[in-house]
Amino acid sequence: MNAVTDTPVTEMPAPFVFTDAAADKVKQLIEEEGNADLKLRVFVQGGGCSGFQYGFTFDEAVNEDDTVMNKSGVQLLIDSMSYQYLVGAEIDYKDDINGAQFVIKNPNATTTCGCGSSFSV
C-alpha cells in the first residue's frame, strides 16, 4: 500500500530478463578475470547485415544513463540508447550443439540475420 494514498502499489515488471544461465556464466567469467568490480554491459550499435548488432563487454564503471539489473550477484548494464531497443528482451546463455554463446531474444526485432547477432526494428 502507498502510505500517501492508501492505494495498492503495483510493481513494474523488469524491463529485461537476465536468465540464471547468463548470470552464472558472467559470474564465472568475472571470477576468472579476478576483478570483482566487473559488470556485464550489453549494448546495441549500428552494423551487421540487418542494421543493428548486439555487443557484450565487461565494464567497471556505471554511467549516469545506465539501467542496472542485479541477478545472482552480477550486475547487468544497459545504456539509455540501447535501452529502447532492448526493452522486453531476454539475455540468456546457451551451451549446446551449436556452441556456447550469449543469446538475446528481442521482441522488438522485426528481422534478424542467420547468425542471430544482427537485427532490425
Swiss-Prot record:
Swiss-Prot/TrEMBL GO biological process terms: iron-sulfur cluster assembly
Keywords: Iron, Iron-sulfur, Metal-binding
Record text on cofactor binding: Binds 1 iron-sulfur cluster per subunit.
Binding residues for iron-sulfur cluster: 49, 113, 115
Highest taxon of the lineage: Bacteria
Listed Gene3D superfamilies: HesB-like domain (2.60.300.12)
GO molecular function: 2 iron, 2 sulfur cluster binding; 4 iron, 4 sulfur cluster binding; iron ion binding
Keyword Metal-binding listed: yes
Matching InterPro entries: FeS_biogenesis (IPR000361), FeS_cluster_insertion (IPR016092), FeS_cluster_insertion_CS (IPR017870), FeS_cluster_insertion_RrpA (IPR023063), HesB-like_dom_sf (IPR035903)
Cofactor (UniProt): iron-sulfur cluster
Pfam (any one): Fe-S_biosyn
Protein role: Required for insertion of 4Fe-4S clusters.
Description of how the protein assembles with itself and partners: Homodimer.
Family, per entry: Belongs to the HesB/IscA family.
NCBIfam families tied to this protein: iron-sulfur cluster assembly accessory protein, PRK13623.1
Protein name: Putative iron-sulfur cluster insertion protein ErpA 1
Lineage: Bacteria, Pseudomonadati, Pseudomonadota, Betaproteobacteria, Burkholderiales
Gene expressing this chain: erpA1
